[in-house]
């Protein structure tokens, strides 16, 4: 199974930045979701961030909330998500991170969840509603299962907490470019470069930037700031929503957009 370290090291040698799209598993249905993720990989995605739909996604804006609703209505479950990930890994071996909420982990059984998903091909699990203060609750079982740890840093994170987060992260640091929930934005925050620079001074762990990246130019700005990866969620999930009646158009638009971002970084 390909690791974050392998992918980020190889891209660094090539002077490239990782393209990391985010999708909700099962949006709008299992088969279409599978085709979408495969199209993203074919367009140049280096790493995947995938969400398991949840009823109360507090960190997400309306675009991803609606994706959660569509996926839930299509019958997506934790068990089906395992099958989905196995199929993706059979298609292409890239690192996969889950971005999700603790209740889903807890209901399934924390140790069993991490073990089963690592065996299916997941490299890390980022629990959006657990802070670094609660990290010990998941770090032990996650590391025991063979998973890397991923934590979030925001523009408001204090330097001492950045150091703590950096020390506990083994996969990559998910750097939130703007305050608030996920969603496409017209302009990227001018604090990104400073935030990436601070983190780079604290850790050798890869630093990836997400939230609000909606254009190839945004991705270029993030890459030039020194980030190791660019995470794009709402923009590509929005292309699913706007093409629900046209699967071929959906796949074509997602492929074109991600290929443009790949070329920009």
Where would I find each of the regions flagged by the language model?
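Glycine/Thr-rich beta-alpha phosphate-binding loop at enzyme active sites
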Residues: 152, 162-201, 239-241
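N-terminal amphipathic alpha-helix/helix-capping segment at the start of soluble metabolic enzymes
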Residues: 1-20, 85-89, 197
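Catalytic beta/alpha-barrel core
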Residues: 73-75, 121-134, 148-157, 182-185
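Catalytic cores of alpha/beta
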Residues: 30-40, 157-167, 209, 213-230
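Hydrophobic faces of well-ordered beta-strands that scaffold small-molecule active sites
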Residues: 19-23, 48-50, 96-100, 125-127, ...
């Amino acid at each position: 199974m390909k690791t974050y370290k392998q992918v980020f090291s190889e891209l660094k040698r090539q002077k490239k930045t990782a393209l990391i799209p985010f999708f909700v598993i099962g949006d709008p249905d299992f088969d279409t979701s599978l085709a979408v993720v495969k199209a993203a990989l074919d367009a140049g995605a280096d790493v995947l961030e995938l969400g398991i739909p949840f009823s109360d996604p507090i960190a997400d804006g309306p675009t991803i909330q609606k994706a959660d609703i569509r996926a839930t209505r299509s019958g997506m479950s934790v068990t089906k998500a395992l099958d989905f990930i196995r199929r993706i890994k059979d298609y292409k071996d890239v690192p996969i991170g889950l971005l999700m909420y603790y209740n889903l982990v807890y209901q399934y059984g924390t140790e069993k969840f991490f073990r089963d998903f690592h065996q299916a091909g997941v490299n890390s699990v980022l629990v959006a509603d657990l802070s670094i203060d609660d990290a010990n609750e998941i770090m032990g079982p996650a590391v025991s299962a063979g998973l890397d740890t991923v934590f979030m840093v925001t523009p408001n994170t204090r330097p001492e907490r950045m150091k703590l987060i950096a020390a506990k992260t083994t996969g990559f640091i998910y750097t939130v470019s703007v305050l608030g929930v996920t969603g496409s934005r017209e302009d990227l925050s001018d604090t990104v470069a400073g935030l990436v620079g601070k983190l780079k001074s604290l850790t050798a762990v890869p630093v990836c930037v997400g939230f609000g990246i909606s254009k190839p130019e945004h991705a270029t700005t993030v890459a030039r700031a020194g980030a190791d990866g660019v995470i794009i969620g709402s923009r590509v999930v929005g292309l699913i929503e706007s093409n629900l009646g046209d699967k071929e158009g959906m796949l074509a638009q997602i492929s074109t957009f991600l290929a443009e971002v790949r070329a920009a970084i």
